[in-house]
């Protein structure tokens, strides 16, 4: 007789999702330093209007350091097994749903949603979606095409002691589509 299937959504990130700050001289760093902000374009295209969100996961969980905001950022890995190299924040701007500006909402459980400003830090394990413009209740709405700029703000902490080798900034995050 047939099968009913939900609409599928396909995400895409510009630059293959890679932010490369190049080589940074340890001598140029103070105790901690902000690197130039990077922007990745994220698009999610669905076969039909779909109720969904984008969830961010830190693949270097436990390695983040960002001053007092350590829990709200993604990690860059360790040096020497224990030295946290720093962290990076994700924020979104220029959010559009089906070609129109849309309010950003977030949730940690997919049930309770909160309206947020576009430049608010996107915490690991939290989901971002869009609500209806002008609505008081922060609830996700179905969209077919979602587009946004993902801003990446990186802060590096200078390792202590003599450095005799290159140290990779090994940050990694996964953005997953969550069907609601």
Protein language model regions, located:
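Mature extracellular/passenger domains of Gram-negative fimbrial/pilin and adhesin proteins
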Residues: 1-180
């Amino acid at each position: 007789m047939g099968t009913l299937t939900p609409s599928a959504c396909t995400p895409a990130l510009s630059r293959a999702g890679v932010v490369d700050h190049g080589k940074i001289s340890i001598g140029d760093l103070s105790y901690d330093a902000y690197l130039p902000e990077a922007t990745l374009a994220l698009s999610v295209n669905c076969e039909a209007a779909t109720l969904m969100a984008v969830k961010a996961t830190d693949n270097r969980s436990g390695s983040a350091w960002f001053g007092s905001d350590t829990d709200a950022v993604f990690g860059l890995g360790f040096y020497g097994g224990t030295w946290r190299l720093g962290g990076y924040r994700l924020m979104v701007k220029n959010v559009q749903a089906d070609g129109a500006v849309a309010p950003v909402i977030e949730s940690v459980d997919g049930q309770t949603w909160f309206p947020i400003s576009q430049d608010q830090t996107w915490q690991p394990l939290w989901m971002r979606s869009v609500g209806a413009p002008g609505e008081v209740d922060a609830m996700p709405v179905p969209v077919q095409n979602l587009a946004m700029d993902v801003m990446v703000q990186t802060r590096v902490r200078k390792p202590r002691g003599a450095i005799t080798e290159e140290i990779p900034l090994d940050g990694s995050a996964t953005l997953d589509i969550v069907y609601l």
